[in-house]
């Protein structure tokens, strides 16, 4: 395919145009008075969302060069989402502001490589400052505040997440599922999460989120390597007749057997997913036994005289729901409280008997996984469209609270970044020279962008609000919900430090890369040829 090559200023301007389009459509959602965006779907009802990364993933432009700009800035959003699970809109707005400011300097003749070095040094300084200003989370009230802000100022959601964290612990698993009623409810159930994902991405049932969701599945638990599909055929036939999904937990599945499972899954013969067993050696056997107790199944192992080809349905475990991503598996079980408690007691006794601190630590991990359970938030809404929006907001809120527990909280609403701008200017003037100094000042001017946008979405003058916030002390910011200047910690308007840090780092990274671009190579669109006029068919230009 022929390529189109664009150089210098033209290349950067084309990228900028794509970025403008994406940044504007994402920025309208920022802040308590941010609006929603409607996404048209090829199948089903349109989706109404308020989540930056979901909007960014949907935007695809006709012009290949502009589309490259969209992809670059989308990366800032998705990397922030991967690292912190929230703050995607902030990352997009920041990256866009840095690129805009930087391109002005490049057009005026500044050296892009020196600017990039300045941007990187500024980002390093700001990361340290964010860590300095972060406060550790002490109580569930602070957790509720973080959750409420991330869910779009929904205090009920904040309280629910704080309650869930109280019950399953800060490291515990909080899972989301679609509820059957109008109310959003919280339920604590048995379950566990371990850090092994699906063996093949073809097992994913939701291609957009790349995860496999199995409702009321059967679970085959074995500690052997499955090399031949013949070993599995008897079980697969029994499960296919029962019409339920199947999860296979094994040491490994070799290529031939895996290929057969994938083909059967894609053809719809049996809804199956396969996951490698967690842990190593004796710990793997112990963890498989934990999972068997949790799901009411048996570990099919030759140590107990059980063979795969002789496995029956009543040897398989059962669960309410299993969610598998590329990195981890969450099992939501139910109804085995007695057995789970007995197993926990057994692990506690082992902990008392062992002298090895390593073994104690590993037993403690197993106990936490088994005893902690899973908090299930059942999302309720009047319509399916509202349900999907609420689910995305709740997901953001859960991620944000976990990030807040990890690295603490800072004043929210764009306040932290706005207050750090003068500090960065002072530091840069003392420590950097010439174009590196210009690079760091690009960042300092861009730091006000999220606050300005939040104010503009609330109908205020962003530039004026930004300057007024800079004059006040560090914890004072602009509450866009009622247009007042308040102490952000007291008002409960807080952001996780990890979210602010990730958004800043990813924005600086993308901005630096865009500014140093001097040439773009993209595919040239092929001209569409009209169909030749044929007997009775008509040419491509005729109306029928």
From Swiss-Prot:
Q: Which InterPro entries match?
A: Chaperonin_Cpn60_CS, Cpn60/GroEL, Cpn60/GroEL/TCP-1, GroEL-like_apical_dom_sf, GROEL-like_equatorial_sf, TCP-1-like_intermed_sf
Q: Which UniProt keywords apply?
A: ATP-binding, Chaperone, Cytoplasm, Isomerase, Nucleotide-binding
Question: Which is a Gene Ontology cellular component entry for this protein?
Answer: cytoplasm
Q: Does the keyword Chaperone apply?
A: yes
Q: Does the keyword Nucleotide-binding apply?
A: yes
Query: In terms of domain of life, where is this protein from?
Result: Bacteria
Q: Tell where it localizes.
A: Cytoplasm
SUPFAM superfamilies found in the cross-reference section: GroEL apical domain-like (SSF52029), GroEL equatorial domain-like (SSF48592)
Single biological process term from Gene Ontology: protein refolding
Q: Where the protein is mainly located, per its record?
A: cytoplasm
Name the chemical reaction catalysed here: ATP + H2O + a folded polypeptide = ADP + phosphate + an unfolded polypeptide
- Quote the record's binding site residues for ATP: 29-32, 86-90, 413, 479-481, 495
E.C. code: 5.6.1.7
Recorded GO terms, molecular function?
Answer: ATP binding; ATP-dependent protein folding chaperone; isomerase activity; unfolded protein binding
The record describes its quaternary structure and partners as: Forms a cylinder of 14 subunits composed of two heptameric rings stacked back-to-back. Interacts with the co-chaperonin GroES.
Q: What family does the entry list?
A: Belongs to the chaperonin (HSP60) family.
Q: Which PANTHER family match?
A: 60 KDA HEAT SHOCK PROTEIN, MITOCHONDRIAL
Q: What does this protein do?
A: Together with its co-chaperonin GroES, plays an essential role in assisting protein folding. The GroEL-GroES system forms a nano-cage that allows encapsulation of the non-native substrate proteins and provides a physical environment optimized to promote and accelerate protein folding.
Q: What is this protein called?
A: Chaperonin GroEL 2
Question: What is the protein's species of origin?
Answer: Trichodesmium erythraeum (strain IMS101)
């Amino acid at each position: 395919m022929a390529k189109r090559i664009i150089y210098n200023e033209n290349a950067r301007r084309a990228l900028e145009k794509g970025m403008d389009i994406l940044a504007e459509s994402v920025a309208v959602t920022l802040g308590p008075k941010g609006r929603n965006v409607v996404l048209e779907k090829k199948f089903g009802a349109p989706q109404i969302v308020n989540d930056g990364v979901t909007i960014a993933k949907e935007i695809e432009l006709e012009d290949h060069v502009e589309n490259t700009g969209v992809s670059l800035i989308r990366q800032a959003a998705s990397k922030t989402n991967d690292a912190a699970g929230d703050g995607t809109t902030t990352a997009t707005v920041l990256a866009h502001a840095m690129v805009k400011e930087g391109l002005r300097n490049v057009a005026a003749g500044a050296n892009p490589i020196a600017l990039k070095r300045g941007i990187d040094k500024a980002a390093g300084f700001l990361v340290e400052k964010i860590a300095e200003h972060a406060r550790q989370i002490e109580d569930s009230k602070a957790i509720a505040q973080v959750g409420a802000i991330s869910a779009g100022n929904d205090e009920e959601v904040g309280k629910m997440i704080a309650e869930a964290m109280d019950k399953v612990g800060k490291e515990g698993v909080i899972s989301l599922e679609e509820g059957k009623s109008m109310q959003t409810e919280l339920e604590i159930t048995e379950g566990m999460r371990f850090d092994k994902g699906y063996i093949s991405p073809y097992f994913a049932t939701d291609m957009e989120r790349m995860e496999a969701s199995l409702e009321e599945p059967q679970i085959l638990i074995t500690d052997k390597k499955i090399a031949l599909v013949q070993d599995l055929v008897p079980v697969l036939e029994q499960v296919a007749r029962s019409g339920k999904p199947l999860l296979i937990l094994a040491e490994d599945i070799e290529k031939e057997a895996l290929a057969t499972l994938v083909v059967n899954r894609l053809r719809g013969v049996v809804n199956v997913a396969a996951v490698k067993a967690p842990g190593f050696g004796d710990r793997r056997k112990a963890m498989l036994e934990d999972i068997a107790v949790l799901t009411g199944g048996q570990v099919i192992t030759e140590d107990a005289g059980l063979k795969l080809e002789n496995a029956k349905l009543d040897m398989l475990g059962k669960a309410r729901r299993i969610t598998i991503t590329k990195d981890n598996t969450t099992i939501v079980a139910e109804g085995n409280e007695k057995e789970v408690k007995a197993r926990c007691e057994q692990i506690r006794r082992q902990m008392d008997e062992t002298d090895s601190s390593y073994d104690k630590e590993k037993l403690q991990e197993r106990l936490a996984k088994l005893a902690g359970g899973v908090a299930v938030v059942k999302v309720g809404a009047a319509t399916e469209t509202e349900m999907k929006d609420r689910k995305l907001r709740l997901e953001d809120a859960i991620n944000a609270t976990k990030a807040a527990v990890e690295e603490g909280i800072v004043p929210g609403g764009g306040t932290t970044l706005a207050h750090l701008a003068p500090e960065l200017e002072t530091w840069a003037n003392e420590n950097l020279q010439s174009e590196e100094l210009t690079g760091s000042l690009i960042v300092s001017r861009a730091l006000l962008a999220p606050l300005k946008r939040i104010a503009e979405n609330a109908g205020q003058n962003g530039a004026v609000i930004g300057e007024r916030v800079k004059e006040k002390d560090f914890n004072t910011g602009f509450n866009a919900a009622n247009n007042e200047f308040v102490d952000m910690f007291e008002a409960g308007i807080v952001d996780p430090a990890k979210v602010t840090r990730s958004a800043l780092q990813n924005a600086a990274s993308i901005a630096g890369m865009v500014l140093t671009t001097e040439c773009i190579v993209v595919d040239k669109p092929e001209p569409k040829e009209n169909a030749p006029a044929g007997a009775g068919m008509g040419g491509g230009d005729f109306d029928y």
